[in-house]
Amino acid sequence: MVTAGMLPRAAVREVEARLRAAGCPDADFDAAELFRLAVGGDARLADAPLGAEQAERLEALTARRAAREPLQYLCGSWPFLDFELAVGPGVLCPRADTEVVAEAAAGMLAGVEAPRVLDLCAGTGCLGLGVKRFCPAAQVTSLEKSPAAYRYLEQNAHLSPVLTITPVQGDLFTYWQTLPEGQLDLIVSNPPYLTAAEMGALQPEVAQEPAMALEAGEDGLVFYRAIAEHYQKALRPGGALALESCNGPACCQRVDGYRVQKRLWRQ
């Protein structure tokens, strides 16, 4: 237990041991982050014993992380590319895989002047903001259904005068009806794609993220089918669609009417 009077390095060792015992991956990194949140600064550079309030904060954070609450939720923000996103309970945590998708998707806009981009199932807005980061001229609209997730999308929508997107609350399964034909240059999405079986075998941290952002029916393809069927007409001739998926071949086989330009695999 973390108590007042503990030296910083001893406190971090205690936190790391408890997180490791709880099965948390990267317990050393997490312990250092929890110390930074509770006390401030780097424990390796601190010498003063912990005060009562500092120890209480660190103990509370340690208990939550040991219960496998995602570190991103405890931090309240998380880096994505070279910017920080607000994140917390009710929204999918930004992941490094999505950075790869954002860069590849932005590359599809080369030579397009003031491209119009739609980000479906936006969550924090990380994918749409990532495209905007790589293609500042892009006009990005980000759609999110969940009220809880939409609050974070709104917070992240105006990170700077340059890094700005338009948040919209709506449902992917009906929003297509509002779109004119042939007006979009790019559609991006990191939709739910886990099967019912995969939902029953989630890592504890992922299990605390919203099921609404993860589950996609028995075969994990419900959202891909909807995007392929309903959103193609919204793209201009030669427009592009960039989707994140963990079951790439199965997804590609079912996206009729599209030519697969590039597949990205991350080990």
Stretch-by-stretch model annotation:
Residues 2-54, 58:
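A short N-terminal interaction module
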Residues 12, 31, 58-59, 71, ...:
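A general structural signal for well-ordered alpha-helical segments in protein cores
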Residues 32-36, 63, 103, 129, ...:
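Generic alpha-helical structural context detector
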Residues 35-107:
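Conserved AdoMet
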Residues 94, 123, 220:
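Short glycine/threonine-rich catalytic loop with a Thr-x-Gly-x-Asp
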Residues 99-199, 226, 248:
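Conserved SAM/SAH cofactor-binding pocket of Class I
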Residues 193-223:
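Mobile active-site "lid"/loop adjacent to the S-adenosyl-L-methionine
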Residues 218-267:
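Conserved Class I SAM-dependent methyltransferase catalytic core
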